[in-house]
Swiss-Prot record:
It comes from Rhodopseudomonas palustris (strain HaA2). Keywords: Cell inner membrane, Cell membrane, Membrane, Protein transport, Translocation, Transmembrane, Transmembrane helix, Transport. This is Sec-independent protein translocase protein TatB. Part of the twin-arginine translocation (Tat) system that transports large folded proteins containing a characteristic twin-arginine motif in their signal peptide across membranes. Together with TatC, TatB is part of a receptor directly interacting with Tat signal peptides. TatB may form an oligomeric binding site that transiently accommodates folded Tat precursor proteins before their translocation. The keyword Glycoprotein does not apply. One of its GO terms (cellular component) is TAT protein transport complex. HAMAP family: TatB.
Length: 188
């Protein structure tokens, strides 16, 4: 405690014997021993109180961390997790039900061509050189966005799929007329 070796204790004992004397030396040593006992007792009490305060502080920290863990696990209880999972499943089922309740989608295939549309397509192709897409008026009105015309629609506008009488219309031949009225027109 004081870091005193044997040689230093012998020096202190010799000085005490010379200074105090041999008669009073045992009484002085007894008194020094009592003071040392009191000092040790005070030191042990202080040490005990200090350790008790440290334990209380550790217990308070442990209790605080335990309460934090308890609060965190309160939100993760299995009943709460099952309730949350059940609500998510019911939401998913409601989404699927709304998809099933919606009206069926009408097909987007064009209506079958009529002879008028073939004549119109043939005329358009002859004038512009591009095939005309044949669609019904209801489909044209229902289209909200401009989409590229699929190749199948172009195929309907070709003359290969047209009825035989409209695919190759007969050439327009002038009807035979009498040459007499034409001659009369030249003469006048």
């Amino acid at each position: 405690m004081f870091d005193i070796g044997w040689s230093e204790l012998v020096v202190i004992g010799v000085v005490a014997l010379v200074a105090i004397g041999p008669k009073e030396l045992p009484g002085v040593l007894r008194m020094v021993g009592q003071w040392m006992g009191k000092a040790r007792k005070l030191a042990s009490e202080f040490q005990g109180q200090f350790q008790e305060a440290m334990r209380e502080a550790e217990m308070a920290d442990l209790k605080k961390s335990f309460d934090e863990v308890k609060e965190a696990t309160a939100g993760l209880s299995t009943n709460n997790m099952l309730t949350k999972l059940g609500s998510e499943l019911s939401e998913a089922a409601a989404i699927d039900k709304s998809a099933l309740d919606s009206p069926p989608v009408e097909p987007t295939t064009p209506a079958p061509p009529t002879p008028e549309t073939f004549i119109e397509a043939t005329t358009h192709q002859a004038v512009t050189g591009e095939p005309l897409a044949i669609v019904s008026e209801a489909q044209a009105a229902g289209a909200h966005t401009t989409l590229p015309v699929p190749a199948e629609t172009h195929a309907l506008a070709t003359t290969d799929l047209a009825p035989p009488d409209l695919a190759h219309p007969a050439p327009a031949h002038p009807e035979p007329t009498n040459s007499e009225p034409a001659k009369d027109a030249k003469a006048s």
